[in-house]
Design a protein with these regions (language model features):
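Cytoplasmic membrane-interface "Motif A"-like loop-to-helix N-cap segments
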Residues: 76-88, 303-316
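Glycine-rich segments within core transmembrane alpha-helices of 12-TM secondary carriers
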Residues: 140-164, 185-186, 374-384
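C-terminal transmembrane helical hairpin of 12-TM major facilitator-type secondary transporters
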Residues: 306-356
Length: 431
């Protein structure tokens, strides 16, 4: 009876929560990386050099870094429904305002403010999922949520490419319409969030009494093994002092450098082979489609075996190989194959990686620790794109920057092996 009840509850959680949070992340990721497509014409209009574009693209993560932890602590206090709704409307408005930048300084400012606006969203959803899904189902839940990122690229790339084919309308150019059109869903979904999200299992009217009782008891039992009697502030400070949190931040730094190097620079790398904006979007979508499939299958295997370490290490190695290959690839076929390695590798690593913090963090400590891992780790999203732009200005090509980012993924793999000796394994999910 317990296995049947568990299966019923997990099925309800899956269909009630995951499709909606995937939609939210789809919109979030599109708004943060569509600048890569805007750059096809925006850079010339604004006079942006590769270094300037890399700096502006990456400076998003400085704002993200500074406001991540406080944003997640507020979410833990006021609830996901209210805070995520606030995050969405703010980032939607800032993203739309990006259409009106007039030069490097305004470009930097709006990208920084977009990072401030989005701070708290990703780790907030990861925290939210940990408050609903039992540990044995957490990697698959995280994978489904994070699959929205490559899915956003797969679907959003052709859409962005098509928008970039638009003629000037009402005095606005193609890249300006790109920012405006793709910002609208975030503002609209803010109102849906207030209706669709439930703050905690205890408030879930859509669960039957026995389902709610089982879920609350299961999650409480898991937390009991991790929580101390420390208060909110003490729990948060303890997490920030935990060396495991710092090491995981460095691991995530490498994967973020790879992910956002792709998001910002892949369209420009593909475009240099002479493709139109629409053709660039179509080719950029191919690796992302495969990444969605790889991410979900890899996460299921991780949950089924209960193993996390090698499920992070091997994809990081594959992604590093792909980036290095892209550095010397001289045909579009080779570039797309290299990007497949990178996309599938980084996407596959993320879900097992994000299943690890909840094995040693809970409560306020989880809110602070997860936010810290995400905020420090996402600084890789600043360093990677900026390194590509700066080294392209210095060397005239993309190779040197791609090799640097590949090295950061190798470091992530080694750090995962080191921290994995502490035993990041959960009980295998029941068959």
């Amino acid at each position: 009876m317990t296995n049947e009840l568990q299966a019923r509850v997990v099925r309800k959680l899956t269909w009630r929560i995951l499709p909606f949070v995937m939609l939210l992340y789809f919109v979030s990721f599109l708004d943060r990386v569509n600048v890569g497509f805007a750059a096809l014409t925006m850079n010339k209009d604004l006079g942006l050099s590769p270094t300037m574009f890399g700096l502006g693209g990456g400076i998003f993560f400085l704002g993200y870094f500074l406001f991540e932890v406080p944003s997640n602590l507020i979410l833990n206090k006021v609830g996901a429904r209210i805070w995520i709704a606030r995050v969405m409307v703010t980032w939607g408005l800032v993203s739309a305002a990006s259409a009106f930048v007039v030069g490097p300084n305004s470009f930097y400012t709006l990208r920084f403010l977009l990072g401030v606006a989005e701070a708290g969203f990703f780790p907030g959803i990861i925290l939210y999922l940990s408050q609903w899904f039992p540990a044995r189902q957490r990697a698959v839940a995280a994978a489904a949520f994070m699959a929205a990122a490559p899915l956003s690229t797969a679907i959003g790339s052709p859409i962005s490419g098509a928008i970039m084919q638009m003629p000037a309308l009402f005095g606005l150019k193609d890249w300006q319409w790109l920012f405006i059109i793709e910002a609208i869903p975030a503002v609209v979904l803010r109102f849906v969030v207030l209706k669709a999200l439930t703050d905690s299992p205890e408030k879930a009217t859509w669960l039957a009494a026995d389902e709610k009782a089982w879920l609350v008891a299961t999650l409480r039992e898991e937390r009991a093994g991790r929580e101390s009697q420390a208060g909110h502030a003490a729990g948060a400070l303890a997490a920030l002092r935990d060396p495991r949190v710092w090491i995981m931040s460095m691991i995530y730094f490498g994967t973020s450098a790879g992910l956002y190097t792709l998001g910002l620079w892949a369209p420009l790398i593909i475009r240099q082979f002479g493709f139109s904006a629409l053709g660039t979007g179509a080719l950029n979508a191919i690796p992302s489609v495969l990444a969605v499939i790889g991410m979900v299958l890899w996460a299921r295997h991780s949950d089924r075996t209960g193993e996390r370490t090698w499920h992070v290490v091997l994809p990081c190695i594959a992604a590093g190989i792909g980036l290095a290959w892209a550095g010397f690839a001289d045909t579009i076929v080779a570039v797309v194959l290299a990007l497949i390695f990178v996309n599938v590798g980084i996407s596959a690593a993320k879900a097992p990686l994000w299943a690890m913090p909840s094995s040693f963090l809970s409560g306020a400590g989880a809110a602070a620790g997860i936010a810290m891992i995400n905020s420090i780790g996402n600084l890789g999203g600043f360093v990677g794109p900026f390194a590509i732009g700066w080294l392209k200005s210095v060397t005239g090509g993309y190779a040197a920057g791609l090799y640097v980012v590949a090295a950061s993924l190798a470091v992530s793999a080694m750090l995962t092996l080191a921290i994995g000796r502490r035993g990041y394994r959960t009980a295998p999910a029941p068959q």
